[in-house]
Amino acid sequence: MRDAIIDLLQSQQLPVADLPLILTDFLVAKDADNIVGVIGMERYGAFGLLRSMAVPPGYRNQHIAASLVQELEKRAHSTGIVAMYLLTETASGYFSRKGYSTIQRDQVPGAVKSSSEFSHVCPTSAAVMTKNLTL
C-alpha cells in the first residue's frame, strides 16, 4: 500500500522523499481496490503536522478530502494532539473553510518547525496554517 500512496502523492506533485517507512499516521480512502484519497500526519509531542493530502482529479468534489481531514483530526485529538499545523501552496482557502488560520512561521512550535517539511521540503512561500483541536 505504501507504493500506491507514494504514486498518488507524486501524481499530485507532493513531496515523498521524507515520508517515514511505516505510514502509521496516514489514512486512505478507497474505491474498491483503488486509493482515491490520502492524508497523513507527523507527531511532534502535543502537535501534529498535517501533510500529504491528495485526492485524484476524478474523485474530487465528493467530500473525500473533507472526510479524511475530519477523521485525521478526530484521531489526532483522541491521542493527545492539541493543535494541527500545515504548509500549503495551493489549498489555504480550503483549509480556511475547515477552521484553519494562517499564521507566521515564527508562531510554529520549535519541534514542528524543525521537521523536514518545514526546514527544507516546502518552500518558504508556502502558507503556514494551524487549528486548535481542543475547542
Language model features: what each stretch is:
Residues 28, 34-43, 47-54:
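Conserved beta-strand in the GNAT
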Residues 108-135:
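C-terminal "cap" of GNAT-fold acetyltransferases
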Residues 74-90:
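Conserved GNAT acetyl-CoA-binding A-motif
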Residues 55, 61-74, 86:
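Conserved acetyl-CoA-binding loop-helix of GNAT-fold acetyltransferases
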Residues 1, 46, 90-91:
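A generic "binding-loop/recognition-motif" signal
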Residues 1-18, 30, 126-128, 132-135:
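Short amphipathic alpha-helix that is part of the acyltransferase structural core
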Residues 89-117:
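Conserved active-site alpha-helix within GNAT-family acetyltransferase domains
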